Amino acid sequence: MGDKIFHNLSGKTLVATPHVITKGIYHKSLIYMLSHTKEGAIGLIFNRLVNHIDLKSFFKIKNDKITTPVMVPIYLGGPVEHEKGFFLHSSDYNKNLLLDFHNDLAVSSNLEISEDIAFGKGPKHSLFIVGYTAWKPGQLEEELETNLWLVMDCNKEFIFADNPESKWHNALKHLGIDEIHFSSQIGNA
């Protein structure tokens, strides 16, 4: 039995399969894959809206030019390190990037982007996400083999869509899958 072929999923979107992941944080989740190597994987759930925050208060922005709250939605990116915040955003903003995917998306995690968003000088599209999802070596591959996830190319329209509740259903439609007809008995051919 030889080594399995490794397919790097960085920059792809994972779509939780219906009827397999039936509860918890990953139920009907969409995860943007930040990094996927043989050493493990990291991603951000981008359809779990939990609240809205005032950027000025949250990041303790001290600037008298911002007099009103700057409310933005906050998303739960996964069960790991909820104290860490990330902006998943369009690549039109390129200051101090944490990651640049060359597919019109980037990730930042610094005070400067929050100030720029508060001043209206930030990226055209952005999501503020706390926490992330991580897999140990081989774990994601096992989950893919057991059909926990479908994989689709990154689609900015899904990521930045206004209604987070419809993102998962729209991803299934994009993949040509009707949830009602999706069998709970799936396997590999």
Swiss-Prot record:
Any one Gene Ontology cellular component term annotated for this protein:
cytosol
- Pfam families reported in the protein's UniProt record: DUF179
Q: Where is the signal peptide?
A: none
Cystine connections:
none
NCBIfam families, sorted:
PRK00228.1-4
Q: Which PANTHER family does the annotation name?
A: UNCHARACTERIZED PROTEIN YQGE (PTHR30327), UPF0301 PROTEIN YQGE (PTHR30327:SF1)
Q: Which protein family is it in?
A: Belongs to the UPF0301 (AlgH) family.
Protein name listed in UniProt: UPF0301 protein RAF_ORF0041
UniProt source species? Rickettsia africae (strain ESF-5)
